Amino acid sequence: RVPVAFFHHFLEDWTDFGKGIEDDEVFEKNIEGHRIARKLFDPDVAKVMNDSLMLMPVEASFVKTAADLRKIEPLSSGSGFMKRTLELTKRVREIYADSDAPVYATSFSPTLVLRSALPEGRRPGLGGPETVIKRFIKEDPEALGEACKTVSEGIMELNRLLIKECGVDGIYLSVNNQAGFFPEEIYRTYISPFEKAVLDDANKLSDVNILHICGFIGQGNDLNLFTGFNAAAYNWDVHTEKVSLSQGKRLFGGKAVFGGFEQKGVLYKGTREEVEKYTYQILDEAGQVGTMVGADCTVPADIDDSRLEWVRQAAIRYAAQPIRKIKYNSESLN
């Protein structure tokens, strides 16, 4: 049968995100959330949720002009953030020590880190004018690219440690260009080369890295921007992009795909029968080879985890049946 996996955050208060470097209570709550979640639903694939350490705190408060971007430095492996991230990952990895499930570490693209670090920055998708970076795009895109390269160096160093020292099986790299925030030429020239570099570097240590093309809160991406990324599997917002799993398989050269459920749709509020029916629809449309069933993004933190088991049981029953006649097309899932 296909593997089934869903991920959700463990900190209910968004203001606690990123406080784990200094706040032990928030840090411990983040770790303990994995233990509690596993008792409720033991996934076929696990991911370390680093809520308390989102996002990498690159120092960029001094940036006032595009030229200042060239002064940004990569985060040191001896930083408090790096040390806490390694501790969190090792301890969460221990929670899954007796599991056969591969365990992934969450990683974010250089631009996501940079946009969050700038004086007017916001976590993309959470609002904020971001007028500073928009001005930099126009004034000196090369400086923006140089900053992305610098930030990527710290990300790559952390990812190497996560794989080699913490024992994670791969990196789950989150990227996006939601709503065309960066013009296509800018993205392809100054942004994506360093996202690819992060992924390619991780590929030297693991052959199961996943690319998550984040469509958070319904803001879409042009998936064609990501066809040149060399991931083992791809996850995107099927419902926002209007690109089904089978269509994604073709778009990404036959690579494995992950997802299918809208996180706040039938999975969150449907009956068991509706959830099971939708699981069958996903598998009828995408097939079982090269497919992992999950969601477009993280599911709501308050979801009833028994619903996730409904999906797995449906996948088990689906696999046990004789070859099914395809009843659904991709449009029925949108």
Outline where the language-model segments fall:
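Active-site loop segments of alpha/beta catalytic cores
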Residues: 1-11, 16-21, 33, 44-48, ...
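Membrane helical hairpin/interfacial module
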Residues: 31-55
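A short glycine/small-residue-enriched secondary-structure motif
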Residues: 9-11, 51-71
